[in-house]
Amino acid sequence: MARSELSALERRWLADPPQALARIATVDADGMPHVVPGGWSFDPATEEMVLGGRDVPRTQRALHVRASGHAAVVVDGLAPGPGWSPWAFVVRGRARVDDDLGVIRIAIDQVTSWGLGSVTAGAAAGE
């Protein structure tokens, strides 16, 4: 279930995340989804997902964010070891283009995650 607040496990995961691509989803003027992989980080001061890449302010995703003011992002992967152990961190929220830094910032209006304990220090604590 989606929440608006980060859990303690999510905060630990964001403080030391595994190397993984993010996928940012936006919607164009016709309502057609647009999904693009890219680099990411988390700004703990503003509690925003920060999505970078090459010349971001001139991209289609930036155009969509400027028009709609919203976006979603997924960071996901598979836990190390045998078997199928997926993990994911999903955010939906208000988005804006930061032209000065050349990134897109997404506020956490809704957050959902699963399997993060398998790829964080909290895994040893049984979280």
Language-model features, listed with the residues they occupy:
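Short, basic/aromatic recognition patches
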Residues: 1-23
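A generic local structural motif
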Residues: 7-11, 36-37, 58-60
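Short beta-strand segments
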Residues: 19-54
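Short, structured beta-strand-loop surface elements
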Residues: 55-110
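Flexible glycine-rich active-site/ligand-binding loops centered on an Asp-His dyad
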Residues: 103-127
